[in-house]
Amino acid sequence: MRKKILILGSTGSIGTQALEVIASRQDQFEVVGIAAGGRDPQLIIQQAQMLGLAADHVAVANEKSATQVSRALGAAVLSGRDAATDLVESVPADTVLNGLVGSMGLRATLATIQLGEVLALANKESLVAGGTFVTSQAAPGQIVPVDSEHSAMAQCLRSGASAEVSKLVLTASGGPFRGWSREEMWDVTPEQAAAHPTWSMGQMNTLNSATLINKGLELIEATLLFDIPADRIEVTVHPQSIVHSMVTFCDGATIAQASPPSMLLSISHALAWPHRVPEAQPALDFSQASTWDFMPVDNEAFPAVELAREVALKQGTYPAVYNAANEQAAAAFLRGRIKFPQIVDIVGEVVAGSSQFAGVASSVEEIIAHESESRRRADALVDKLSR
């Protein structure tokens, strides 16, 4: 029997690649619904028609785009800010791939967990924002990571018992400004920040990779997914992006997962978990000479990782504060209001002034309230810096 799949964020980088994977494995998977923000209504229409989806199996957040898609499909699609969550709640599925961008994916993540469906999670921000409020509601193995780094860790962790794990090692490409000083990055433009040396991603994910905020979010996500404290997670720069992550065990052995830099493998693995998909992507060719480099993160130039470690150790809703403040500061940089290094400066300042967020959230509303306050503070700092 084919697995029924919902894809949230179908027009984004993860969503389009997931559709590519599923198109080549129609004997294993069936797409039963899609959700998107609405920036590209024509692509949503094309996807819905190609998949043969009824209008009520399509969700579009942007109301204007939803009207356009509804007209093309001949009936009303689900629309509005909570359209993706409405889709999850109304269309039964075996697996929900959450590839939405930012913390807007939180409600859909929670809805998936509460329905008992498998959550293939690419929307790390929803886990970071929700923290233990999310993980405490999930059954063991219900959340399956899509990020290549966490997928790699999950694969490596199958090599030993949890009590045998000494540390996790996250790899980072280093982004387009690897080796630059803070001073050299002062006049970086949004166009420069959008040029990732290895991966093809959406605008926000690419910018987060340039600041290493993305790696900070991944560190926090790893603590939640694998129940390993942040002081036992190492981050190393690996420019080739071939070793996606490693796990060191108590006997001194380190197990690494290596494959060419592509999301096809980790997406396939998440959809088929706990099984592997044959020939999901080409394997490494060891007959070709190559060099793999590993080096420490320059924490002076890129303080985002150590700030994330601090946030993860504090717990509470600090991770939600970290993420929300970054979303505001990053948007301000893209609009030309602040300088590139000031993105993480603002995040650090908001986190430092948020002692009231130390408690564990007891509701989605509480998380959203803390996020809103963090955004307000970040916006105030942007206003101050851009005068």
Curated annotation (Swiss-Prot):
Membrane-crossing ranges are none
Q: Which residues bind NADPH?
A: T11, G12, S13, I14, G37, R39, N123, E125, G202
Instruction: Tell me what reaction this enzyme catalyses.
Output: 2-C-methyl-D-erythritol 4-phosphate + NADP(+) = 1-deoxy-D-xylulose 5-phosphate + NADPH + H(+)
Q: Which of this chain's residues are annotated to bind Mn(2+)?
A: D147, E149, E218
One example GO MF annotation: NADPH binding
Q: In which pathway does it act?
A: Isoprenoid biosynthesis; isopentenyl diphosphate biosynthesis via DXP pathway; isopentenyl diphosphate from 1-deoxy-D-xylulose 5-phosphate: step 1/6
For this protein, the record's InterPro entries field holds: DXP_reductoisomerase, DXP_reductoisomerase_C, DXP_reductoisomerase_N, DXPR_C, DXPR_C_sf, NAD(P)-bd_dom_sf
What is the protein name for this chain?
Answer: 1-deoxy-D-xylulose 5-phosphate reductoisomerase
